[in-house]
Each structure stands twice: as C-alpha cells, then as structure tokens.
Amino acid sequence: LVKMQVLLLSLIMIVGIAIQLNNAFYQIEIGHYLFDLFAIHLIGFIIWAFLALFVQSIFNNTYLSLFLLILLALGISQFPSLGIENYLVRFNESPDSSFYLNYSDMNGYGHSLLPFFLYRFYWLLFGIFIYFFTLLIWQRELTNSVFERLTVAKNRYRGKLSFTLMISLICFLSFGFYI
C-alpha cells in the first residue's frame, strides 16, 4: 500500500511540475514538492492505510468496510460540532492544519511544523498498534464471525508479536499523555 501511495504522490509531483512548466513558471522547487508530498502528506496516508487494513480484517464484506472508512472520514470533520475539540481523539488530525501548514517564502512553514509532526507521530504510533493488532486477527483460515477471529487472535497472542503490540500501545499512550 505504501508503494502505491508513493507512486501516486510522485505522479502528483510530475503533473504539478508539468502544469508549472506549461504556465511558463520555471522556478521549480523540487525540495518543496518532496517535503510537502512525502514528509507531510504521506504520513497521514500511511496512517489511513493502517486503519483500512484493520477494518478490512474485521469485516468480511469489502463494501461494508469501505463504507465504514468513508463514514469515519466524514464523521471526523463533524467532531467539533459535537463538542469534541481535542485532537488526541480525532483520528489522524493535527491542530488546525489549514492554519498551521500555510507555506510562505519568507519563513517556510514557520512554527507550525513541530506541533504538526508531534500529532502525526502520535497517530503513527496508533497506526502501528492497529497494524500489529491486525496481524493478530488476520484471516488465515476460514472464520465466519468476529468472535471466532478474536478467539484465534487470543491463541496467536504470544512471542514477538505480543511484545511488539504491547510496546506500541505503551508508546502510543505515553506519547498521548506527553502531548
């Protein structure tokens, strides 16, 4: 999934450069393209990919999983209207990214990169946790219900996978308390 996201972001960069050249703007900032697409946006896409793998492993129905992911993506934007203002509970969100990540030639992103990357790292830790949890419940044999998958996951919970799952959960919670 990550390779596909990198490929699509590279395509966006190539098309953006082509549009700039077509409009006779020859001051192309490759570094800015690379940083914006691969350092800022790719992290969020990877976190969503972890969640997509998790939801797909829970439900057998592909369309139901896709619907739930779309519903979650649309629902997160409505959290402030429900009174949920804290970014620690709003999945893959960082503090007011429309304000914080405005780029200017004078000072770049300014003071806004540190809080943005802190929240991205926080949600990346959660993504790593759900990735390892997904490995526990991944359907390797024929199971019909979520309960059966959780039973299989309970039997698989040992060794390096359980250690990594616990470490990622502890890191996620610790970093959440730090922020």
Tell where the protein language model's regions lie, with residue ranges.
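Bulky hydrophobic/aromatic packing residues
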Residues: 1-2, 128
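Secretory targeting signals
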Residues: 2-60, 100, 115
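Hydrophobic alpha-helical membrane-interfacial segments at the cytosolic entry of transmembrane helices
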Residues: 3-11, 68-74, 167
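Alpha-helical transmembrane segments
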Residues: 12, 16, 49, 128-132, ...
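Residue-identity detector for glycine
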Residues: 16, 31, 36, 44, ...
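Terminal transmembrane helical anchor/hairpin motif
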Residues: 25, 63-137, 141-152, 179
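Alpha-helical transmembrane segments and their helix-start/interface "positive-inside/aromatic belt" motifs
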Residues: 52, 59-71, 160-166
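Internal/C-terminal transmembrane anchor helices
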Residues: 151-179
